[in-house]
């Protein structure tokens, strides 16, 4: 039998060679695949558009109108008048803005560093680390409304735990939530109880992504734990720090549930989110006014979200 120079018998059948057409057919989508893909993309998109984009854009549009919420034919276009009145003749606006700023600064200076410190400690794989993480993270699972109820009981003037402890030392009961000079700080401590666990988890995730070789190299060079953290670990946490900043800004703006549960957001606890609710669902039903304040909150949040997005794109280019 003759044999070709390629080593394949001339009489043998040619081996099956996949063609381009065969490759295309192997990756051809079935009708079921298309339906599943359409549902997986379409349903979340519709939910996002219906529950996020439509309300947000509607709020922006209504901020340029005067409307009492009764009948679409009663909507009146007034341009920037709502914004001018908010910044010039609306007394609660600047105190609420100041309280939100205090909320943000307090979050950045107190619970965020505490969360970072706890993350560094728990990253060392101590005994019962998982238990500690669960206990510290537990308040994050609770809604802000439930946190408000818990701390309202803690701060109670007559039967609260804090005043009961102070009474053992001969201190008279303190009205933590009724005193305008104290209630904001009392509520900030309650909010920090939840925020610490949130920051701890974020920083733990960031610490797990730091290359252990960097820490080992710093230790070989004779760096102390503090020096290794300051000059090696913390700079490597820059992406997480941006995330923490954005989340903290958003948390400080959306702090509505906690103060509304405690005293309805009055008497020293005015916040921008409370003003939005009071104008939209209050007795006056000033939909345009409340929408204008909500739009101001949206703009503030968008600034930090854009900073975060630009940072992500910059990291990807590297």
Report each predicted region and the residues it spans.
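Short, Lys/Arg-rich, polar N-terminal cytosolic tail immediately upstream
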Residues: 2-31
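Compositionally biased, low-complexity segments enriched in small residues
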Residues: 1-2, 15, 96, 129
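A structural signal for multi-pass alpha-helical bundles of membrane permease subunits
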Residues: 33-318
């Amino acid at each position: 039998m003759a044999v070709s120079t390629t080593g394949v018998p001339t009489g043998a059948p040619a081996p099956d060679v996949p063609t381009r057409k065969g490759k295309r057919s192997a990756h051809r989508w079935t009708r079921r695949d298309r339906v599943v893909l359409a549902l997986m993309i379409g349903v979340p998109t519709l939910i996002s558009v219906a529950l996020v984009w439509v309300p947000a854009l509607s709020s922006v549009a209504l901020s340029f109108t005067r409307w009492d919420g009764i009948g679409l034919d009663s909507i009146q276009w007034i341009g920037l008048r709502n914004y001018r009145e908010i910044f010039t003749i609306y007394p609660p606006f600047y105190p609420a803005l100041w309280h939100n700023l205090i909320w943000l600064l307090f979050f950045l200076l107190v619970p965020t560093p505490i969360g970072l410190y706890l993350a560094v400690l728990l990253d060392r794989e101590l005994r019962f680390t998982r238990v500690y993480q669960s206990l510290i993270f537990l308040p994050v699972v609770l809604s802000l409304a439930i946190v408000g109820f818990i701390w309202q009981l803690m701060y109670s003037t007559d039967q609260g735990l804090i005043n009961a402890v102070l009474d053992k030392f001969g201190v008279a009961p303190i009205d933590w939530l009724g005193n305008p000079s104290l209630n904001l700080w009392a509520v900030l401590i309650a909010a920090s109880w939840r925020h610490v666990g949130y920051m701890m988890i974020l920083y733990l995730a960031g610490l797990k992504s730091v290359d252990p070789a960097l820490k080992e190299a710093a230790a070989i060079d004779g760096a102390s734990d503090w020096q290794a953290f300051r000059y090696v670990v913390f700079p490597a946490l820059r992406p997480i720090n941006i995330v923490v900043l954005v989340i903290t800004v958003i948390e400080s703006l959306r702090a509505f549930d906690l103060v509304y549960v405690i005293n309805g957001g009055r008497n020293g606890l005015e916040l921008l989110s409370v003003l939005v609710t009071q104008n939209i669902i209050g007795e006056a039903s000033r939909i345009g006014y409340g929408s204008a304040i909500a739009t101001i909150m949206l703009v503030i949040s968008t600034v930090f979200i854009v900073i975060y997005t630009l940072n992500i794109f910059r990291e990807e280019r590297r």
